Regions:
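ATP/NTP phosphate-donor binding region
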Residues: 3, 14, 18-80, 84, ...
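Short glycine/serine/threonine-rich phosphate/pyrophosphate-binding segments
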Residues: 34-35, 89-94, 202-207
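Short glycine-rich anion-binding loops that position phosphate/pyrophosphate groups of nucleotides
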Residues: 87-89, 110, 199-201
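Gly/Ser-rich helix-loop-strand patches that form or flank binding pockets
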Residues: 97-107, 114
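Catalytic core of DAGKc-family lipid kinases
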Residues: 112-191
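ATP/nucleoside-binding phosphotransfer catalytic cores, i.e., glycine-rich phosphate-binding loops
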Residues: 157, 165, 170, 181-184, ...
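Gly/Ser/Thr-rich active-site loops/lids in small-molecule metabolic enzymes
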Residues: 187-232
Length: 310
């Protein structure tokens, strides 16, 4: 993978050295309350002689006809991508630009906003710094799910956060067989299975009792059984060089494989899903004033006074 932006590697990330002349902005087009912020960003970038590109969509095409680009141009020509919205919009954008090496940052207009680190009130000042090349980036690994049915690959898809195997409308538990590098690990009954990257460890997996993984750990991922009817089986972190295979043992239908909470794939009995590290990754722009652990404190409400010693 070739990064045209990288100049110097430091402990805080990768410094950017290329002059920024084109920025793509992805926004939830139905969130018209975000349009005033978008207008302010466009005005700033126009004043800095930076071209703004927007994706094709009815609302955006009507309001910004000269800035809308087709999907291919939007992806190919962007030097940096700004996302206005919640984590869902960010993940959708990240998957769109995965493997391109294009840095992405998010301005939070949603609720929790783990990935959208920038608040609307600080967006303009940061974008001004960004145009002056005053920012760093960090890579985030992605995982790949390959669905095998009757010995043939049905689909292959990458994910940034997590992939989840769940039952549909049935209340009965499902049975899943797990293997790591073709070695049998366990066969359990439960509500499903979560496979998460370090980035996704603070999403569904965290709610299901999984551990938090620091995203800078780019060499491992986790699997987390959902409500297993087996006290001994617990979440496990495994190296990214290992392949996890989950086989569907349940006899009833209406099972789903959900990718990043956005793509749902129906599963059948004896389907096999192989999970491994994807060759693609996502490049995130670092917040200049916040560390990962500060974001954790804020987003998860830990909020302990740092001067407390007891």
């Amino acid at each position: 993978m070739l990064y045209l932006f990288i100049d110097v590697l430091s402990s805080s990330g990768l410094y950017i050295s290329v002059m920024i002349t084109k920025i793509a902005i992805n926004i939830n087009p139905d969130d018209t309350d975000s349009f005033p912020l978008l207008d302010s960003i466009i005005d700033l970038l126009d004043a800095r002689n930076v071209t703004v590109m927007l994706p094709e969509h009815g609302n955006l095409t009507d309001k910004y006809p000269h800035r809308v680009k087709d999907n291919e141009t939007f992806i190919r020509e962007a030097q940096v991508v700004a996302v206005i919205g919640g984590d869902g919009t960010f993940i959708r954008t990240a998957r769109l630009f995965s493997g391109t090496g294009t840095p992405i940052f998010g301005i939070n207009r949603g609720r929790l906003g783990f990935l959208n680190e920038f608040h609307p009130g600080e967006a303009l000042s940061f974008i001004d710094q960004l145009v002056d090349k005053n920012f760093t980036v960090s890579p985030r690994m992605m995982m790949q799910a390959s669905l095998q049915r009757d010995g043939e690959e049905i689909t292959r898809i990458d994910f940034l956060n997590d992939a989840v195997i769940t039952k549909g409308s049935f209340s009965r538990p499902i049975r899943i067989r797990l293997e790591i590098d073709e070695e049998f690990l366990s066969c359990y009954s439960g509500d499903g299975l979560i496979i998460a990257t370090a980035t996704g460890s603070t999403a569904y997996s965290l709610s299901a009792g999984g551990p938090i993984m620091v995203p800078q750990d780019e060499h491992s991922y986790l699997f987390n059984p959902i409500c297993p009817h087996m006290l001994a089986i617990r979440p496990m972190i495994i190296p990214d060089v290992m392949i996890l295979k989950a086989s569907i043992v349940s006899e009833f239908e209406n099972l789903l494989l959900t990718i990043d909470g956005q793509v749902a794939i129906e599963l059948e009995r004896q389907d096999e899903i192989r999970f491994k590290r994807s060759p693609s990754e996502v490049i995130l722009v670092n917040h200049p004033e916040k560390t990962y652990f500060e974001v954790l404190r804020q987003k998860l409400g830990w909020g302990v006074n740092r001067n407390d010693t007891g």
